[in-house]
Amino acid sequence: MTITISAVILAGGLGRRMGGVDKGLQFWRGKPLIETVYQRLHRQIERISINANRNREIYARFGVPVFSDRLAGFQGPLSGILTALERATTDYVLFVPCDCPNFPLNLLEKLKSAVEFSQISLAYAHDGERDHPTFCLVSTQLKNALADYLAGGERRMLYFMQMHGAVAVDFSTEKQGFININNLADLNSP
């Protein structure tokens, strides 16, 4: 089974734990988080877009397509995922959050292997202790099911994933790669 894949950086949140600032545009190690995440992701895949609900013109400076959630009101990462699946011209979409600059460089390789080997529609990262559902590879065939799920008022990512037979992919040897930047103090950490 050969599948086509594109990628989306999720940067559409409200940044509540950061006082409402746009997380992706906050500086970490001398450059915006989104730039670090983009560069790391670009080492794994060429076709990248950014999901952002604010400051789209700034995100567009990276020279990739930028789109907002179709659903209004900052409804969470599943809203950005839905819009990405609806826009995609590939079989699958790889998602990564904008606030995790050290994610594994083998993320796509391992998630892709899982969906191909198991012939499933969805795989996400697990670090040996915790699930990381925003690091996921999702089939575009799930867009209607996700639209129905969100229309029913649900927002729980893992629940949706489990409903659709998702596989948690082991990244226990890359656990440090899933530490995210949650607050302004984290921006100054090494």
Curated annotation (Swiss-Prot):
GO process terms (BP): bis(molybdopterin guanine dinucleotide)molybdenum biosynthetic process
Keyword set, alphabetical order: Cytoplasm, GTP-binding, Magnesium, Metal-binding, Molybdenum cofactor biosynthesis, Nucleotide-binding, Transferase
The organism's place on the tree of life at top rank: Bacteria
Binding site for Mg(2+): D99
Localization in the cell: Cytoplasm
EC number of this enzyme: 2.7.7.77
Reactions listed under catalytic activity: Mo-molybdopterin + GTP + H(+) = Mo-molybdopterin guanine dinucleotide + diphosphate
GO cellular component: cytoplasm
Gene3D superfamilies registered for this protein in UniProt: Spore Coat Polysaccharide Biosynthesis Protein SpsA, Chain A (3.90.550.10)
Cofactor(s) this protein requires: Mg(2+)
GO molecular-function term, one example from the UniProt record: GTP binding
Entry-linked Pfam families: NTP_transf_3 (PF12804)
UniProt-listed InterPro entries: MobA-like_NTP_Trfase, Molybde_CF_guanTrfase, Nucleotide-diphossugar_trans
Residues that hold GTP according to the record: L10, A11, G12, K23, N51, D69, D99
Homology family: Belongs to the MobA family.
Record's comment describing the protein's domains: The N-terminal domain determines nucleotide recognition and specific binding, while the C-terminal domain determines the specific binding to the target protein.
Functional description taken from the UniProt entry: Transfers a GMP moiety from GTP to Mo-molybdopterin (Mo-MPT) cofactor (Moco or molybdenum cofactor) to form Mo-molybdopterin guanine dinucleotide (Mo-MGD) cofactor.
Listed HAMAP family: MobA
Subunit structure: Monomer.
Name the UniProt record assigns to this protein: Molybdenum cofactor guanylyltransferase
Organism ancestry: Bacteria, Pseudomonadati, Pseudomonadota, Gammaproteobacteria, Pasteurellales
